[in-house]
Regions:
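Boundary/junction segments of secreted and surface-exposed precursor proteins
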Residues: 1-11
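Accessory beta-strand-rich segments of carbohydrate-active enzymes
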Residues: 11-13, 17, 22-157
Length: 158
């Protein structure tokens, strides 16, 4: 599987959905023709390299299945400082929580612990070298009528 580790901010299991940003700067002396990276998250991610959106996912799954996406990062790289970043939303819960429609969209079954996993090149592998920031002003509001649709999202930009 590579040397990337599942990473998340903090140590505890959250009881509310969370939106967390991850970022790492990497210095590249040259750009390879191809650089395959594998990525997954609990529950959803958007991968950015040098400010360009590279991928979003993972493919939705339920139960014990966890999909990992593979992307070619080479077209997004340049020599010098390269910034790799990911936005990750974690919908908390387990099968019982999902059955009550209080874990997020019913097509995305989550676990109690959020996470990001990236691997394929040691410079990019997720580890303690990533900075992370939980977005405190981002809230998930429960749906009032049709809970199976998931949450409404609210951003406080102040």
């Amino acid at each position: 599987m590579g040397n990337g580790k599942w990473i998340w901010y903090g140590a505890g299991l959250g009881s509310e959905p969370e939106y967390v940003l991850f970022r790492k700067e990497i210095v590249l002396e040259s750009v390879p023709e191809s650089l395959l990276l594998s990525i997954s998250a609990d529950s959803r991610y958007i991968l950015w390299i040098n400010g360009k959106r590279v991928s979003r996912g993972p493919v939705r799954a339920g139960g014990a299945v966890r999909y990992i996406d593979t992307v070619d990062a080479a077209p997004f790289l340049h020599t010098g400082v390269t910034v790799v970043a990911a936005d990750v939303i974690h919908y908390v819960g387990d099968a019982q929580t999902a059955a009550r429609f209080s874990a997020g969209p019913c097509s995305i079954l989550a676990t109690g612990q959020g996470g990001l996993l990236l691997y394929g090149d040691p410079r990019f592998d997720t580890d303690e070298g990533y900075d992370c920031l939980a977005l405190e002003g981002y809230r998930f509001l429960p749906a009032r009528i049709a809970g199976y649709l998931g949450f409404f999202e609210e951003m406080d930009g102040s």
